[in-house]
Design a protein with these regions (language model features):
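Class II aminoacyl-tRNA synthetase-like tRNA-binding/catalytic domains
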Residues: 2-135, 143-145, 231, 335
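A generic structural signal for well-ordered coil/turn residues at beta-strand boundaries
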Residues: 62, 78, 98, 117-123, ...
């Protein structure tokens, strides 16, 4: 049998021909960044520059960090990590007295490389002290519109899907989205006293025609439904705010005042792509410690490793004012505003394979 012909490898990004094709997108990226910095300045935000090297990279089960060592002059090594978000540092600044702060910088996440993921990427994160979380929602929607204005497009586009950044935003709760797109009554499976009922959720999944593995817990099933049935249907035609996450998935968000089953956590989608993740921020240090413990126990079970807690962060959280915050994937925003298909098309220098 003759060998099948194969395509030659793609030219590196630094070859003149490839760079010539990429350059218009990269220049658009710079213009979007300038416009967003202008918006933040108009809103009286202070730009801050948190260090990437941290004692703890973050304490979420499924986020994987790059580990390194910090070696002192005496040769003693201390474990350090590249942060997965500047959140801990920025909340320390809120505790110190800053009121409106923003950071546009690189973050690192291991085990992530795909059309929508890059191991080193640019995150825009900002916080407003003494502000409801709807305020940072509004900030983000305005920035999405700015990106479209700067690139001169009326629709955000990604792989055949479109979203109008100027149309009225769809805001729905996670429970509403599960009912609408999967036919699942999520709140019926949540009990703040006895814990979430994984078997109730599994039964609804089977009724909806979704496969259920032999070994499961509630959080795993929730994530499966969200990624397979819900997320691909969000932000189609217009931008979607997915709000009021289950309290068990609150991460660093406070519980909703009107329903302890859900939290002030939201995500923003366009063209089926998650662009941003925001919170009405939790300021209860002991509750945050409890949540981190649960996350790291599960991480140890699944991946055989856990990250240390940042005790300084927990101390700062105890004196931090009420606040709202949000993290926006800047590269993804550029990708949708320019119609790029892969995230590597919108970064000046991709990480080497």
């Amino acid at each position: 049998m003759r060998d099948r012909p194969h395509s030659p490898p793609a030219s590196p990004w630094w070859t003149p021909a490839v760079h010539r094709d990429r350059r218009p997108i990269l220049l658009a990226r710079n213009r979007i960044e300038a416009a967003i910095r202008g918006y933040l300045a108009d809103q009286d935000f202070v730009m801050v520059d948190p260090p990437g090297l941290q004692r703890s990279p973050g304490n979420e089960t499924h986020l994987h960090a790059f580990a390194t060592q910090m070696i002192g002059e005496d040769g003693t090594a201390q474990a350090r990590y590249l942060h997965t978000s500047p959140e801990f540092s920025m909340k320390k600044l809120l505790a110190a007295g800053e009121g409106r702060i923003a950071s546009l910088g690189h973050v690192w996440r291991n085990r992530e490389r795909s059309a929508r993921h890059h191991p080193e990427f640019t995150m825009l994160e900002w916080y407003r002290a003494e502000a409801p979380y709807e305020t940072v929602m509004d900030d983000c929607i305005r920035m999405i519109g700015l990106a479209a204005q700067i690139t001169g497009v009326s629709m955000l586009r990604h792989r055949g899907l479109e979203a109008n950044p100027f149309a009225e935003v769809e805001r729905i709760s996670v429970a509403e989205a599960f009912l609408m797109h999967a036919g699942i009554d999520l709140l019926a499976t949540i009990d703040t006293d006895r814990g979430n009922d994984a078997h109730k959720l599994a039964a609804q999944m089977r009724t909806a025609g979704l496969a259920v593995p032999d070994d499961f817990d509630w959080s795993y099933l929730f994530t499966r439904i969200l990624t397979e049935k819900i997320e691909p249907r969000l932000g189609i035609g217009r931008v979607t705010i997915l709000d009021r996450y289950p309290a068990s998935e609150a991460a660093l968000a406070r519980k909703s005042a009107d329903d302890p089953r859900v939290a002030e956590r939201f995500e923003i989608y366009a063209c089926g792509v998650e662009l941003a993740n925001g919170f009405g921020e939790l300021t209860d240090a002991e509750e945050q410690r409890r949540r981190f413990g649960i996350e790291m126990t599960e991480k140890e079970r699944l991946y055989g490793e856990a990250y240390p807690l940042d005790e300084d962060f927990l101390d700062a959280l105890a004196i931090m004012p009420e606040a709202s915050g949000i993290a926006l994937g800047f590269d993804r925003l550029v990708m949708l505003a320019t119609g790029a298909e892969k995230i590597e098309q919108v970064v000046w220098v991709p990480v080497s394979e």
